[in-house]
């Protein structure tokens, strides 16, 4: 017998670690992998969007580079455990002129942990829980980003347009 809630926590850490291990810069690996492995940082995967399901080629959440930050705007859905997560692996479209999977990039987006009363205390983030049947150990959320800032250095691998490829390597 297993407990899906425990498994879902491990899956989030595995996805983030695999992304960073396979596609991260040496600096990103040094910063994040030890913290994920020790449990000091709890990551979550932020990929799925409303009305697109798992069709990542239709992804619309945008990240625009402004100086030393990416400003993220858009909506995500069915995100598991985002409230208490410290780090989001956030798939965004950085080049709207590229069709389909091209132009997608992965950001390593730190955020403060939320609470039941204030799930998303970070500026530029809001959202709400999706009520589900059955999964008592997992909480699913919708998230809205409005100019949510991520440091430019947190572009996974330091190269735009590699997000889908990086994700498929996990």
Regions found by a protein language model. Give the residues of each.
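A structural signal for short hydrophobic beta-strand segments in well-ordered beta-sheet cores
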Residues: 63-64
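Internal helix-loop-helix
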Residues: 1-40, 81-87
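Short acidic, glycine/serine/threonine-rich loops at helix termini
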Residues: 20-21, 55-59, 82-85, 100-102, ...
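A short core secondary-structure module
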Residues: 73-123
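Glycine-rich beta->alpha junctions and the first turn(s) of the following alpha-helix
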Residues: 122-170
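Short Gly/Pro-enriched turn/cap motifs at secondary-structure boundaries
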Residues: 51-54, 78-81, 96-98, 131-139
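Long, well-ordered alpha-helical segments
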Residues: 24-31, 67-73, 106-116, 142-163
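A short, Trp-centered hydrophobic/proline-enriched beta-strand micro-motif
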Residues: 39-47, 91
């Amino acid at each position: 017998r297993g407990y899906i809630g425990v498994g879902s926590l491990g899956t989030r850490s595995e996805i983030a670690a695999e992304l960073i291990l396979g596609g991260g810069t040496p600096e990103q690996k040094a910063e994040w992998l030890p913290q994920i492995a020790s449990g000091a940082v709890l990551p979550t995967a932020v990929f799925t969007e409303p009305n697109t399901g798992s069709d990542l080629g239709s992804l619309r959440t945008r990240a625009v580079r402004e100086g030393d930050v990416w400003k993220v705007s858009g909506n995500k859905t069915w995100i598991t455990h985002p409230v208490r997560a410290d780090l989001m692996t956030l798939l965004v479209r950085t080049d709207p002129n590229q069709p389909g999977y091209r132009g997608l990039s992965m950001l390593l987006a730190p955020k403060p942990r939320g609470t039941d009363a204030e799930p998303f205390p970070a500026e530029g983030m809001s959202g709400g829980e999706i009520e589900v049947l059955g999964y008592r150990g997992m909480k699913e959320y919708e998230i809205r980003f409005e100019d949510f800032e991520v440091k430019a250095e947190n572009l996974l691998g330091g190269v735009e347009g590699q997000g889908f490829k990086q994700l498929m390597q996990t």
